[in-house]
């Protein structure tokens, strides 16, 4: 199934998806300065900017949906997309919309998860890939990878270790999504094995 990838910034997760050879039909950035657009262009992938500034949420999401429909996208990967999507968008892709989060959910949802982990003194952190639902980082968990929190870690060091696992895990989950292997029964996701 064709994937659409939504991005906001650097695009390192997008690059991991590109390097994995996934069927990406279009990359959409909500910021024209997003470096991810150059990564898409270099890979020969269609890419567009749909800015959110000055638009109501539903109007912005309608523009996203129009671009995704034009490219026949069947599933969506949020790869560093820094906007919260409403039910209006989410309901178009039931169990076909995934996100990554830099914590072992349900711990530390929302912004600054890495800083929250350090502030709480946890010994393990990590990355979660989950289905997006109507809650903030609360959708059914597809896969997780843990990393140790080392003495002396700061946000940068811990986030770099998490990011390495994210770049490994996200393409594997996205491939399972694209091939239709994932199934969700309540909060239990089946069909993914590393």
What is each model feature region?
Residues 1-194:
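One-carbon transfer enzymes
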């Amino acid at each position: 199934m064709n994937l659409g990838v939504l991005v906001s910034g650097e695009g390192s997760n997008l690059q991991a998806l590109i390097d994995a050879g996934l069927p990406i039909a279009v990359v959409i950035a909500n910021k024209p300065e997003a470096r991810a657009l150059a990564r898409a262009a270099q890979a020969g992938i269609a890419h567009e900017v749909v800015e959110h500034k000055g638009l109501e949420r539903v109007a912005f999401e309608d523009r996203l949906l129009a671009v995704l429909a034009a490219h026949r996208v069947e599933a969506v990967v949020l790869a560093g997309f820094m906007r919260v999507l409403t039910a209006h968008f989410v309901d178009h892709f039931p169990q076909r919309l995934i996100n990554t989060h830099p914590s072992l959910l349900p711990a530390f949802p929302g912004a600054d998860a890495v800083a929250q982990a350090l502030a709480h003194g946890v010994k393990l952190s990590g990355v979660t890939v989950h289905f997006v639902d109507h809650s903030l980082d609360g959708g059914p968990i597809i896969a997780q990878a843990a990393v140790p929190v080392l003495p002396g870690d700061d946000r940068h060091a811990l986030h770099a270790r998490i990011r390495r696992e994210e770049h490994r895990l996200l393409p594997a989950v996205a491939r399972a999504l694209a091939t239709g292997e994932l199934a969700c029964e309540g909060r239990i996701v089946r069909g993914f094995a590393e």
